[in-house]
A protein has these predicted regions:
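Extracytoplasmic cell-surface/polysaccharide-interacting catalytic and binding patches
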Residues: 2-183, 188-312
Length: 312
């Protein structure tokens, strides 16, 4: 007898229902895309915004100024050694790299071959604290100064005489007037007489403020001279500073290798009253370094102690 109940089998999967899951996902995805397309863009939160750095401003690289370099040991340079052997001051200074390099090396103690006490060289410094060595020093050779003279002390070193001739010629050519000289080289013995005369007239303190004692005078080196204005006839040294020649010399002397050794601003260092007539020869290179460096005394130029008084 057959049972009225038939065995129950799982109903076959509907093809529509079997594809329902993928279709649902598709519908969902389409909905999302449509909502994104139709809805306004969401504003990102402040924390989500990445702040970009400001662009770097490109600046021009400054030009590198390359100047002359000083040798680590200038005194070992072949050119310096050769110049020292023949006592050529200009070549020695050139071997150091020029006037300013020479000065810098001396001040730094990097020039053991250079003595500021040697009166045979243009860089010698003689003052109230630095007597000449030897004290009765005399230059090896002298030449007549090619300018009008008011005394018989009309000589100087040959390089000084030549430079003075060029200076006087250019001053006249430029309309400044004629320049002569009162004194050039004075020997130790003549300086004894000169200083004694000042002592008689002004007393010891007055003499020491206006005249060097023997052995302490730049005139004894042959590197110094006192100049005067000669318009028709030559005047005295005291009037020189107020003349057209005095103004021209103050402005231009350095171009010929000279400096005005005793200025008003340097009295506390040198111990001498201003002497606009007293020219000291350093040579063109050192005089240019002195001028461009704004110096007013040789003591400052070579970083030496002030010397306003004698030791005794």
């Amino acid at each position: 007898m057959t049972s009225a109940l038939q065995p129950q089998h799982a109903a076959p999967r509907s093809p529509i229902r079997g594809a329902a899951v993928p279709a649902g996902l598709a519908v969902t995805a389409i909905g999302i895309l449509l909502s994104l397309a139709g809805a306004p863009a969401a504003v990102p939160s402040q924390a989500a915004v990445r702040v970009l750095p400001e662009p770097v401003v490109v600046q021009a690289v400054p030009e590198v100024q390359v100047g002359a370099t000083t040798a680590a040991d200038p005194c070992s340079e072949p050119s310096v050694l050769e110049a020292i052997a023949v006592a050529d001051d200009a070549a020695i200074i050139a071997g150091f790299g020029g006037g300013e390099s020479f000065r810098a090396a001396v001040v730094a103690g990097n020039a053991p071959c250079i003595s500021l006490s040697d009166p045979a060289h243009v860089w010698v410094v003689v003052n109230k604290a630095r007597p000449l060595d030897p004290v009765e020093f005399a230059p090896a050779s002298l030449a007549d100064l090619p300018v009008p003279m008011t005394t018989r002390s009309g000589q100087a070193r040959s390089d000084v005489a030549a430079a003075m001739g060029a200076l006087a010629a250019d001053a006249a050519a430029e309309g400044a007037g004629s320049i002569g000289a009162n004194n050039g080289y004075r020997s130790y013995d003549l300086q004894v007489v000169t200083h004694a005369s000042h002592v008689r007239n002004s007393g010891q303190a007055g003499a020491d403020a206006s005249s060097a004692r023997a052995g302490h005078s730049e005139h004894q080196t042959g590197l110094a001279l006192d100049v005067v204005a000669c318009d028709g006839s030559c005047g005295g040294i005291d009037a020189f500073g107020g003349t057209a020649q005095g103004a021209w010399v103050a402005e231009n002397a350095w171009e010929y290798g000279f400096i005005v050794r005793y200025e008003q601003v340097g009295t506390g260092i040198t111990g001498y009253k201003p002497e606009p007539w007293h020219l000291r020869y350093l040579g063109p290179e050192l005089a240019a370094a002195y001028h461009h460096g704004g110096y007013h005394t040789l003591e400052e130029f070579f970083a030496l102690p002030a010397a306003p008084d004698y030791a005794h």
